[in-house]
Amino acid sequence: MTDSPRPELDMETQEFVHQLFDLARQGNSQRLEQLLQQGLPPNLRNHKGDSLLMLASYHGHADTVRLLLAYKADPDLRNLAGQTPLAGAAFKGDLAMVELLLAGGADVEGASADGKTALMMAAMFNQAEVAASLLAHGARRDAQDAAGLTPLAAARMMNAEATVALLSRPH
């Protein structure tokens, strides 16, 4: 089987597609819902592999995330860099979004291509509240990334004092 070239999109179509992803970035739930009702795929991804859910969650739009999850958007769909929406929310320290994604079925142990979990992201960037929530949802303290780093080791490497303290406590 040969790879067929991707179809070229005209400028009008390209602009429409760009606007779709802007709706997610901006949290325009009303317009997105209209389009989802008309058959817009909830797992549509852009040229970077970012899904509508990834963009809405990264930009903190809880209502849009709830909408996309209701339309069966995959909370574990990774972008081309291998990142999940949960890891993005953990990196940003958005506790409410982390909780929402977990409630929507996100895998607490879902790792990127280099083995980094959401707990590792929270640990590295000193997001102690998020790290505590992830631990409460079953994130593994002993998980290792491709370099063999645990969340605690990653936090130490980044001088993330609050998460070092949290992860150093007996569990």
Swiss-Prot record:
Domain of life: Bacteria
Cysteines paired by S-S bonds: none
Keyword Transferase assigned: no
ANK repeat residues: 48-77, 81-110, 114-143
Gene3D superfamilies, sorted: Ankyrin repeat-containing domain
Keyword Magnesium attached: no
Keywords assigned: ANK repeat, Repeat
Name of the protein this chain belongs to: Putative ankyrin repeat protein PA3287
